[in-house]
Amino acid sequence: MLQVYLVRHGETQWNAERRIQGQSDSPLTAKGEQQAMQVGERARSLGITHIISSDLGRTKRTAEIIAQACGCDITFDSRLRELDMGVLEKRQIDSLTEEEEGWRRQLVNGTQDGRIPDGESMQELSERVHAALASCLELPQGSRPLLVSHGIALGCLVSTILGLPAWAERRLRLRNCSISRVDYQESQWLASGWVVETAGDVSHLDAPALDELQR
């Protein structure tokens, strides 16, 4: 049975400022760096063999810190990027106009093909993160990969594995540097395919991360 660990990046400057990041970027805070170190300490006991990361700066830095602890190389995969939030990226949440808030709500409330102008839909996000996860099945037998990605992207992945719609990710609390695990099983008696073992574990962190509204 293949076990895949899923880690959200550490806290960033824009997380702390309540800015919409999407595929734009901001650096990890000192707290975010510490969170990544704590994931690294935990990961050393998990037998991680591969680290696969989104190619955005905040995930790259998180992956580098974890890789240093695990002694693993990093592969970057753009399919693990965060949802493209279009024209709302870099904006503070509290600064959105009524029209802009309407775009955001369409996206997160499951409106068919809802998207922010110049952004992508939750369905498009779901397709690419599932493709990235499926690539793990091509790794050598006995591999135990760790994927570093983003809040909405990982929430969408876990939700859809559970058979929920992509926009149900808002019902999952995946804090900065939380660890989730999904397993691929083949069984005559149990559900074959991907199953969720754990979601949003933060027991390795000193203190809870920000309860962000935006990732």
Curated annotation (Swiss-Prot):
It catalyses: (2R)-2-phosphoglycerate = (2R)-3-phosphoglycerate. It holds the Pfam family His_Phos_1. The active site is at H9, E82. PROSITE patterns: PG_MUTASE. Keywords: Glycolysis, Isomerase. One of its GO terms (cellular component) is cytoplasm. GO terms for biological process: glycolytic process. This is Probable phosphoglycerate mutase GpmB. It comes from Salmonella arizonae (strain ATCC BAA-731 / CDC346-86 / RSK2980).
